[in-house]
Amino acid sequence: INGATGSAGQLAVQIARYLGAKKIIATGRNAQTLAALDADECIQLTADDKTLSGQFSATSAAQIDVVIDYLWGHSAEVLLPALAKYTPAGRPVRYVQVGSLAGADIALNGAVLRSAPLVLMGSGIGSLSMPHLLAATGEMLQAAVPGKFTIATTPRPLQEIAAAWPRDDSQKRTVFTLG
Protein backbone atom coordinates (compact mmCIF):
# COMPACT_ATOMS: atom_id res chain seq x y z
CA ILE A 1 0.00 0.00 0.00
CA ASN A 2 1.83 3.05 -1.28
CA GLY A 3 0.79 5.94 0.94
CA ALA A 4 -0.40 3.93 3.92
CA THR A 5 0.06 6.74 6.44
CA GLY A 6 -2.93 8.79 5.22
CA SER A 7 -6.40 7.93 6.48
CA ALA A 8 -7.38 6.04 3.30
CA GLY A 9 -4.08 4.11 3.33
CA GLN A 10 -4.48 3.21 6.99
CA LEU A 11 -7.96 1.91 6.23
CA ALA A 12 -6.59 -0.05 3.26
CA VAL A 13 -4.15 -1.84 5.59
CA GLN A 14 -7.04 -2.84 7.85
CA ILE A 15 -9.15 -4.03 4.92
CA ALA A 16 -6.27 -6.02 3.43
CA ARG A 17 -5.71 -7.73 6.79
CA TYR A 18 -9.45 -8.46 7.13
CA LEU A 19 -9.58 -9.92 3.60
CA GLY A 20 -6.70 -12.27 4.42
CA ALA A 21 -3.67 -10.71 2.73
CA LYS A 22 -0.68 -12.95 3.44
CA LYS A 23 1.74 -10.05 3.67
CA ILE A 24 1.09 -6.32 3.82
CA ILE A 25 3.83 -3.90 2.83
CA ALA A 26 3.14 -0.28 3.73
CA THR A 27 4.93 2.84 2.52
CA GLY A 28 4.72 6.37 3.84
CA ARG A 29 6.69 9.34 5.09
CA ASN A 30 5.57 9.39 8.71
CA ALA A 31 7.72 6.86 10.61
CA GLN A 32 5.53 6.97 13.72
CA THR A 33 2.34 6.26 11.76
CA LEU A 34 4.07 3.49 9.77
CA ALA A 35 5.19 1.81 13.00
CA ALA A 36 1.64 1.86 14.35
CA LEU A 37 0.15 0.10 11.30
CA ASP A 38 -0.68 -3.59 11.28
CA ALA A 39 1.71 -4.09 8.37
CA ASP A 40 4.25 -6.88 8.01
CA GLU A 41 6.84 -4.60 6.45
CA CYS A 42 7.20 -0.82 6.25
CA ILE A 43 9.18 1.34 3.83
CA GLN A 44 9.77 4.95 4.77
CA LEU A 45 9.53 7.16 1.70
CA THR A 46 11.89 9.79 3.09
CA ALA A 47 14.89 7.65 2.07
CA ASP A 48 16.96 8.54 -1.00
CA ASP A 49 16.09 7.01 -4.39
CA LYS A 50 18.86 4.39 -4.30
CA THR A 51 17.72 3.13 -0.89
CA LEU A 52 14.06 3.15 -1.93
CA SER A 53 14.83 1.30 -5.15
CA GLY A 54 16.71 -1.35 -3.17
CA GLN A 55 13.86 -1.76 -0.70
CA PHE A 56 11.25 -1.89 -3.47
CA SER A 57 13.38 -4.42 -5.38
CA ALA A 58 13.69 -6.71 -2.36
CA THR A 59 9.95 -6.65 -1.69
CA SER A 60 9.16 -7.17 -5.38
CA ALA A 61 11.28 -10.32 -5.47
CA ALA A 62 9.08 -11.77 -2.72
CA GLN A 63 6.06 -11.64 -5.08
CA ILE A 64 3.63 -8.80 -4.77
CA ASP A 65 0.16 -9.48 -6.15
CA VAL A 66 -1.50 -6.06 -5.77
CA VAL A 67 -0.24 -2.53 -5.18
CA ILE A 68 -2.75 0.08 -4.01
CA ASP A 69 -1.21 3.51 -4.70
CA TYR A 70 -2.61 6.59 -2.98
CA LEU A 71 0.42 8.74 -3.87
CA TRP A 72 1.48 8.29 -7.51
CA GLY A 73 4.22 10.83 -8.28
CA HIS A 74 7.85 10.13 -7.47
CA SER A 75 7.33 7.00 -5.36
CA ALA A 76 5.53 5.36 -8.31
CA GLU A 77 8.43 6.33 -10.58
CA VAL A 78 10.79 4.40 -8.30
CA LEU A 79 8.42 1.52 -7.48
CA LEU A 80 7.20 0.55 -10.97
CA PRO A 81 10.67 -0.17 -12.45
CA ALA A 82 11.54 -2.26 -9.36
CA LEU A 83 8.34 -4.26 -9.79
CA ALA A 84 9.09 -4.80 -13.48
CA LYS A 85 12.67 -5.89 -12.90
CA TYR A 86 12.36 -8.06 -9.80
CA THR A 87 8.87 -9.56 -9.78
CA PRO A 88 9.09 -13.32 -10.41
CA ALA A 89 7.88 -14.26 -13.89
CA GLY A 90 4.50 -15.79 -14.45
CA ARG A 91 2.21 -13.86 -12.13
CA PRO A 92 1.02 -10.39 -12.98
CA VAL A 93 1.11 -7.55 -10.48
CA ARG A 94 -2.05 -5.44 -10.40
CA TYR A 95 -1.07 -1.83 -9.77
CA VAL A 96 -4.15 0.13 -8.72
CA GLN A 97 -3.74 3.90 -8.92
CA VAL A 98 -6.17 5.50 -6.46
CA GLY A 99 -4.80 8.93 -5.60
CA SER A 100 -2.15 11.43 -6.54
CA LEU A 101 -1.07 13.10 -3.29
CA ALA A 102 2.57 13.08 -4.45
CA GLY A 103 1.90 14.26 -7.99
CA ALA A 104 -0.53 13.82 -10.87
CA ASP A 105 2.06 12.74 -13.45
CA ILE A 106 4.97 10.34 -13.62
CA ALA A 107 7.76 9.70 -16.12
CA LEU A 108 7.66 6.01 -17.04
CA ASN A 109 9.89 4.32 -19.59
CA GLY A 110 7.75 2.15 -21.88
CA ALA A 111 10.19 -0.75 -21.40
CA VAL A 112 8.94 -1.05 -17.82
CA LEU A 113 5.52 -2.11 -19.11
CA ARG A 114 6.92 -4.35 -21.85
CA SER A 115 9.34 -6.19 -19.58
CA ALA A 116 6.99 -7.54 -16.92
CA PRO A 117 3.38 -8.59 -16.42
CA LEU A 118 2.26 -5.32 -14.83
CA VAL A 119 -1.43 -4.49 -15.02
CA LEU A 120 -2.05 -0.78 -14.42
CA MET A 121 -5.56 0.05 -13.25
CA GLY A 122 -7.34 3.06 -11.87
CA SER A 123 -9.86 3.15 -9.07
CA GLY A 124 -12.27 6.02 -8.84
CA ILE A 125 -15.54 7.33 -10.15
CA GLY A 126 -15.83 5.92 -13.66
CA SER A 127 -13.49 2.95 -13.27
CA LEU A 128 -16.35 0.72 -12.09
CA SER A 129 -19.95 0.55 -13.15
CA MET A 130 -22.40 2.03 -10.66
CA PRO A 131 -23.82 -1.41 -9.72
CA HIS A 132 -20.29 -2.74 -9.04
CA LEU A 133 -19.37 0.37 -7.05
CA LEU A 134 -22.53 0.10 -4.93
CA ALA A 135 -21.96 -3.62 -4.34
CA ALA A 136 -18.34 -3.08 -3.29
CA THR A 137 -19.34 -0.20 -1.02
CA GLY A 138 -22.02 -2.38 0.57
CA GLU A 139 -19.50 -5.18 1.16
CA MET A 140 -17.11 -2.78 2.90
CA LEU A 141 -19.89 -1.33 5.05
CA GLN A 142 -20.93 -4.86 6.04
CA ALA A 143 -17.30 -5.70 6.91
CA ALA A 144 -16.67 -2.51 8.94
CA VAL A 145 -17.96 -3.84 12.28
CA PRO A 146 -16.57 -7.39 12.16
CA GLY A 147 -13.31 -6.02 10.72
CA LYS A 148 -13.15 -3.35 13.43
CA PHE A 149 -12.15 -0.76 10.83
CA THR A 150 -11.22 2.60 12.33
CA ILE A 151 -10.05 5.93 10.98
CA ALA A 152 -9.13 9.17 12.71
CA THR A 153 -11.89 11.75 12.46
CA THR A 154 -12.51 15.38 13.30
CA PRO A 155 -16.15 16.04 14.24
CA ARG A 156 -17.52 19.41 13.11
CA PRO A 157 -21.04 20.84 13.44
CA LEU A 158 -22.88 20.88 10.12
CA GLN A 159 -23.29 24.66 10.32
CA GLU A 160 -19.46 24.93 9.93
CA ILE A 161 -19.49 23.14 6.57
CA ALA A 162 -18.44 26.21 4.57
CA ALA A 163 -15.32 26.70 6.70
CA ALA A 164 -14.46 23.01 7.09
CA TRP A 165 -15.01 21.82 3.51
CA PRO A 166 -11.89 23.39 1.93
CA ARG A 167 -9.59 22.10 4.69
CA ASP A 168 -8.31 18.82 3.35
CA ASP A 169 -6.45 16.65 5.85
CA SER A 170 -5.23 13.29 4.58
CA GLN A 171 -4.57 12.18 8.18
CA LYS A 172 -8.12 12.71 9.51
CA ARG A 173 -11.55 12.79 7.94
CA THR A 174 -14.04 15.48 8.83
CA VAL A 175 -17.36 14.13 10.08
CA PHE A 176 -20.23 16.60 10.18
CA THR A 177 -22.59 16.31 13.12
CA LEU A 178 -26.19 17.47 13.46
CA GLY A 179 -27.33 19.61 16.37
Predicted segments, located by residue:
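Mid-domain Rossmann-like dinucleotide-binding core that forms the NAD(H)/NADP(H) cofactor-binding site
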Residues: I1-D48
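Local beta-strand N-terminus motif with an aromatic residue
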Residues: A39, Q63-I64, P92
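C-terminal hydrophobic helical "lid"/dimerization subdomain
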Residues: P131-G179
